[in-house]
């Protein structure tokens, strides 16, 4: 792939439920984000705080997570994965050594499975490429 934006396009192709997406560095810096009507709207401050959640991932279900000025409950975390939910919206975020892949989605639990699969696919690809 030629650029970070290509990974965002590929992620959107993995699930129609994905509405916005970003790839950020482990420091919260933005590497790529969806734009236009699907603009990923998280602020720089939110992204720095969000990236730091992976430093103590097991505490995240107790506190939740904030993205795009929305507070999400976090019913589940895994070693390098955070799942956030609020009503019929949510996100999946997967961390690699240097990056965090985030996809915001709308839909029910059945649709969330394809979102998770897409996020994990991109994260695994980045990890295998040294990121």
Swiss-Prot record:
One Gene Ontology MF term: actin monomer binding
Gene3D superfamilies: Dynein light chain 2a, cytoplasmic
Subcellular location: Cytoplasm, Cytoskeleton
GO cellular component: cell cortex; cytoskeleton
Example of a GO biological process term: muscle thin filament assembly
UniProt keywords, alphabetically: Actin-binding, Cytoplasm, Cytoskeleton
InterPro entries: PFN, PFN_euk, PFN_sf
Chief localisation class: cytoplasm
Tissue: Expressed in the intestinal wall, the spermatheca, and the pharynx.
Family as reported in the entry's similarity comment: Belongs to the profilin family.
Function statement: Binds to actin and affects the structure of the cytoskeleton. At high concentrations, profilin prevents the polymerization of actin, whereas it enhances it at low concentrations. By binding to PIP2, it inhibits the formation of IP3 and DG.
Assembly information from the UniProt record: Occurs in many kinds of cells as a complex with monomeric actin in a 1:1 ratio.
Name of this protein: Profilin-2
Organism: Caenorhabditis elegans
């Amino acid at each position: 792939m030629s650029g970070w934006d290509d990974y965002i396009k590929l992620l959107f192709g993995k699930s129609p439920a994905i509405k916005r997406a970003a790839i950020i560095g482990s420091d919260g810096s933005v590497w790529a984000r969806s734009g236009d009507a699907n603009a990923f709207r998280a602020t720089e401050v939110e992204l720095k705080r969000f990236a730091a959640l992976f430093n103590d991932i097991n505490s995240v279900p107790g506190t939740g997570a904030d993205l795009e000025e929305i507070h999400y409950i976090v019913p589940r975390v895994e070693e390098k994965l955070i799942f956030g939910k609020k009503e019929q919206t949510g996100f999946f975020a997967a961390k690699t050594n240097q990056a965090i892949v985030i996809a915001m989605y709308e839909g029910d639990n059945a649709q969330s499975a394809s979102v998770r699969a897409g996020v994990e696919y991109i994260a695994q690809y980045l990890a295998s490429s040294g990121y």
